[in-house]
């Protein structure tokens, strides 16, 4: 059993099933505008920053103005679909509550902006368990850079190496690993690459498995 001093969770795709909603909104937005986005590109969007995703689509489509309209349309669809269809990932509430109740400080490190992230955490009853939260609009470099995890550790007052991180995406796992954290991956859309699979301490089927690995 591992004994971290704190646990840092990603949000999108890890605690809440935003990746399913995001992929559906991308497919619908692209279809509305007559654009075909390959499944491989949609999978690459998992854990990807908006600027990086935009660059990928511009390289595919070649029309910057069309891409700007696509991203605007997708953002509107995503917010509507998120409010209607979003669910927690299996075991998310139970895992976060169990770690908190065992006395482990729990933090959130999400690329989503605070104004969008915190209402979701309140909605699902998770906000009450976090000792600190770091959001995408509060850091300079997005995942796979380690900034957000380093900042979470700083706010927790804990060395990054003494923290466990929980992620669903390859880019997110790379960020946590680069920060020096013991990293678990709970993949849904994006299978871990061989190097990430080797570097992570565990690849979990669901968050139901996590408490036993950290608190027994």
PLM feature spans:
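Helix-loop "lid/cap" segments that line or gate small-molecule binding pockets
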Residues: 29-30, 49-63, 120, 152-153
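Conserved SAM-binding loop
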Residues: 15, 88, 106, 141, ...
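Asp-based, Mg2+/Mn2+-dependent phosphohydrolase catalytic module
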Residues: 1-5, 97-100, 113-216
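Short, acidic loop-to-helix structural element flanking the phosphoryl-transfer center
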Residues: 3, 80-108, 114-118
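Metal-dependent phosphoesterase signature
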Residues: 36, 41, 58-97
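Active-site neighborhood of HAD-like aspartate-dependent phosphohydrolases
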Residues: 1-43
